């Protein structure tokens, strides 16, 4: 599987998972994956284009009962501020990431004519930052290459961090004239009884965001009572 598909709030979300090394998203041992994909003469470029073709075919066949195409939010390279992914700050230069993002959008949107993808960028913002706007604009591909501005915010019980980052997000959204939302958040296992009302809802009511999405629930045999974020 080369991308992960989730459904929430009437929208589909998609993100790439498997790098060309054969590992998963966390396989950052090879820092030249993106560089290889960007080389039009490389076998990695040809393979990645095949992946994009498969995604394009999927998107163009995703239709509702009325026959209309179903839109879904596509955030292929989420948390690009972090070092863990093969597309992240450890494995790419600023220009490589920007070129990679634009290459992806250009091929899907302009070459394949896919227009039901909503391209979302989503830096990770867990703490309070002296330059939150700079984190939101980190390796910004350009206004014409992004449709939706998100942030992944695992603030735990630090409501002040969530509040300040939401404020920065909505300000950046207004500046760019693009919708915004929280593309990942939550606390593992919910240790606070009023977590939903005080740590999530209260900060959200002060800002205008389009959505908030919790991270997954996953059954793990040795910690089945721990890894859940959504209920």
How would you describe each model-predicted region?
Residues 178-231:
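Substrate-binding cleft of secreted/luminal carbohydrate-active enzymes
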Residues 2-8, 58-68, 138-144, 169-175, ...:
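Acidic (Asp/Glu)-rich catalytic clusters
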Residues 9-13, 69-75, 116-120, 145-150, ...:
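Structural preference for beta-strand elements that scaffold enzyme active sites
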Residues 8, 133-135, 139-191, 227-231:
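Glycoside hydrolase catalytic-domain groove-lining segments
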Residues 49-60, 98, 102, 160-171, ...:
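Amphipathic, non-transmembrane alpha-helical secondary structure
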Residues 19-20, 78-82, 124-129, 153-158, ...:
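Solvent-exposed loop/turn segments at secondary-structure junctions
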Residues 2-114, 215:
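Substrate-binding cleft of extracellular glycoside hydrolase catalytic domains
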Residues 75-77, 101-134, 178-190, 214:
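Aromatic-lined carbohydrate-recognition surfaces of secreted/lumenal glycan-active proteins
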């Amino acid at each position: 599987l080369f991308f992960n598909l989730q459904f929430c709030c009437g929208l589909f979300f998609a993100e790439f998972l498997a790098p060309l090394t054969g590992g998963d998203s966390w396989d950052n041992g090879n820092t030249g994956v993106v560089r290889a994909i960007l080389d039009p003469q490389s076998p990695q470029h040809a393979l990645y284009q095949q992946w994009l073709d498969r995604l394009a075919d999927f998107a163009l066949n995703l239709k509702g009962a009325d026959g209309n195409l179903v839109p879904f939010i596509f955030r292929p390279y989420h948390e690009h501020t972090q070092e863990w992914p093969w597309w992240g700050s450890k494995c790419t230069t600023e220009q490589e990431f920007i070129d990679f993002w634009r290459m992806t959008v250009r091929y899907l949107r302009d070459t394949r004519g896919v227009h039901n993808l909503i391209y979302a960028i989503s830096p990770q913002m867990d703490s309070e930052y002296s330059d939150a706007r700079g984190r939101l604009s980190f390796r910004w591909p350009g206004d014409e290459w992004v449709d939706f501005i998100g942030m992944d915010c695992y603030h735990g019980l630090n409501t002040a961090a969530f509040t300040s980052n939401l404020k920065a997000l909505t300000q950046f959204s207004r500046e760019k004239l693009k919708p915004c939302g929280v593309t990942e958040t939550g606390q593992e296992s919910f240790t606070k009884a009023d977590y939903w009302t005080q740590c999530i809802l209260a900060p959200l009511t002060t800002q205008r965001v389009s959505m908030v999405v919790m991270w997954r629930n996953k059954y793990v045999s040795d910690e089945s009572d721990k890894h859940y974020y959504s209920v």
